Amino acid sequence: MNDWLHFTAEEKIAAVQLYTTIKDNIADSLAPGDEQLIRRHVLQAIASHQLQRDIFGLNPILMALQTANLASAEIGLKRDGVFAILLYSNILCGFETVDQISDSFGDSVAAILRGLCRIHDLYKKNPVIESENFRNLLLTFAEDMRVILIMIADRVNLMRQIRDTTHEEAKREVSEEASYLYAPLAHKLGLYKLKSELEDLSLKYLEHDAYYMIKEHLNATKRSRDAYIERFIAPIAQKLTEAGLKFHMKGRTKSIHSIWQKMKKQKCDFEGIYDLFAIRIILDSPLDKEKMQCWQTFSIVTDMYQPNPKRLRDWISVPKSNGYECLHITVLGPKNKWVEVQIRTERMDEIAEHGLAAHWRYKGVKSEGGLDNWLASIRAALEAGDDLQVMDQFKMDLAEDEVYVFTPKGDLLKFPQ
């Protein structure tokens, strides 16, 4: 049971620490006996000697623990999603079957594992993912929303771990897939921090010189950028305080990937990008005064600095389908520089930063259940126009009126049903 021969000394320490953290993350969703049961299954898998390191030399148990920690802490998955992550290796190596998992842990965990296995089979059949058809088929196969969330968490974790690998071709394939497939999925689900991390790491691995060129420029201009931000926000802070508003402000440097995209789109060098940062005003507002105080802040900012009305984005009156709420406006600041200002409340900020995890916290949800209304709106966004009205909890039958088939050459084609 305690055979740790697959583990280095550092991995042993990391595994114990991760397991403890995960247990704390999902403690409020565990039933009596759950913790002992999952620990026994994981230890049995280790002792079976059926698990092997992957192409990058990464330990599958440690990877599962890292992914489970990310999924629980940064996305908000609870008992069923986390257990599926920890048990997935057992299924792949044939140590256990999905039916056996169902008997031990319940139908919900088994359903997630079936979804993960279906997508694993899809990858084996057609590993080429550079098509919109593949993305749609992937979503169609994932009938449980948590499958997609786990795949995003798994890819973020993998991208974090392969930094020093010598398998450059495999690293490139993983990075291209992260950029093309998983970053857009994370974006649609409101997981903006994970989306930015996937994009930045992909750029770092695929366009090494461009990534470090931008990073060095950002480091070199940090002092002047910070001084400008202080000059910009000082009069706003004074007016907001005089208005009796509770708030804090911060400057946020835009991601390296987004700066690189602007440079390519505008066909200019780093010095030609004017909006390297955004100012975020975060209000401590009671729920019933959120909209009023956001618009009051908007009025104060635009009275002080000339706005560009074409750059107004109002996601407070009509939030994005993934739950994002914020006012965006671009104004002309000191030295005739355009500055993007984002206005939102503490609640809106946490949702913008943490996506699903924040929604679940604000709803006081202790398990993955009870989120069908919000997840239904996410699903509607992913469906991109389908007329389905009835949405089962966590279901994502995204192409009910379409059929996907493989050609003899392995290409994916989409047809009306």
Label for each model-derived stretch:
Residues 57, 103, 124:
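Short gly/ser-rich anion-binding loops that grip negatively charged ligand groups
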